[in-house]
Amino acid sequence: MTPQLILASTSVFRQALLQKLGLAFGSCNPDIDESPMTNESAQDLVLRLAKAKAKAGATHFPHGLIIGSDQVAVIDGKIIGKPLNRENAIKQLSQASGKVITFYTGLALYDAKTGEVTAQVEPFTVHFRQLTAAQIVAYVDKEQPFYCAGSFKSEGLGIALFTRLEGRDPNTLIGLPLILLTEMLLNHGIDVLAD
């Protein structure tokens, strides 16, 4: 019997991405402390948090196959996450203007029944165009990207902020690397292309 697939996230963006695969799934709020540890790298942080989110979902779904994901960006060597408000979003985009920024998305798949966890970090690089203060304010006011790492929604108007995108899977930038996820699911006997 195939275990129940669970997305340990309340993100509407991640839920919409997972729906693209046409699989039945549930979701839950992982409710974990997302604070970085002292001197923790961006890659280690997102990997740890993705695993923690997936494992937290097992509390509600002890026989589930649980997906956890986390994303941060690195600007000038500093880890940034969700801005949470207008002022921080404007600040983040001002810092990113004209720069090349790497986003790191951690993805974990946890089999709550066996305790097996598979996890990996998927990088994605974004080349920001040189933005004026007026463009940044206008963008933030239009899309209000307060709950998106890096303060933009690449699936919407945010695409106008960039000159180039580099990575294996554009879904990674939205928060859920679907190519990597389909590979992980296949290793658990779930083929998204099967009838």
From Swiss-Prot:
The record marks F13, Q71, E155 as: Important for substrate specificity. Pfam families: Maf. GO terms for cellular component: cytoplasm. Its EC number is 3.6.1.-. Its cofactor is a divalent metal cation. The keyword Cytoplasm applies. The active site is at D70. It is an enzyme of class 3 (hydrolase). CDD domains: Maf. Belongs to the Maf family. YceF subfamily. Nucleoside triphosphate pyrophosphatase that hydrolyzes 7-methyl-GTP (m(7)GTP). May have a dual role in cell division arrest and in preventing the incorporation of modified nucleotides into cellular nucleic acids. This is 7-methyl-GTP pyrophosphatase.
